[in-house]
From Swiss-Prot:
UniProt entry tagged with the keyword Disulfide bond: yes
Subunit structure: May form a non-covalent dimer.
Post-translational modification summary for this protein: Contains 5 disulfide bonds.
Name of the protein in its database record: Conotoxin p21a
Residues with the 4-hydroxyproline modification: 24, 43
Free-text note on domains in this protein's UniProt record: The cysteine framework is XXI (CC-C-C-C-CC-C-C-C).
Main location: secreted
Tissues showing expression: Expressed by the venom duct.
Gene3D superfamilies reported in the protein's UniProt record: 1.20.120.1800
GO cellular component: extracellular region
Length: 83
């Protein structure tokens, strides 16, 4: 079992954030869509997609302010073995 698949975390987070910024006020609803979108745009994003832990954090915290949620979520584990 590979606990933390190797992938380009910075690509996943950047692409997810860029996508979310296209949906002002809808970030919470769009986080998982944007995570899937990032998966198609980042190489080697593994079987589970592009940093799902970050996308989940953004969906919970984003509300109307993507940037403040970004600050909370930037260090979130991509793959949490507890879930």
């Amino acid at each position: 079992f590979e606990l933390l698949p190797s992938q380009d975390r910075s690509c996943c987070i950047q692409k997810t954030l860029e996508c979310l910024e296209n949906y002002p006020g809808q970030a919470s609803q769009r986080a998982h869509y944007c995570q899937q979108d990032a998966t198609t745009n980042c190489p080697d994003t593994y079987y589970f997609g592009c940093c799902p832990g970050y996308a989940t954090c953004m969906s919970i915290n984003a509300g109307n302010n993507v940037r403040s949620a970004f600050d909370k979520c930037i260090n979130r584990l991509c793959f949490d073995p507890g879930h």
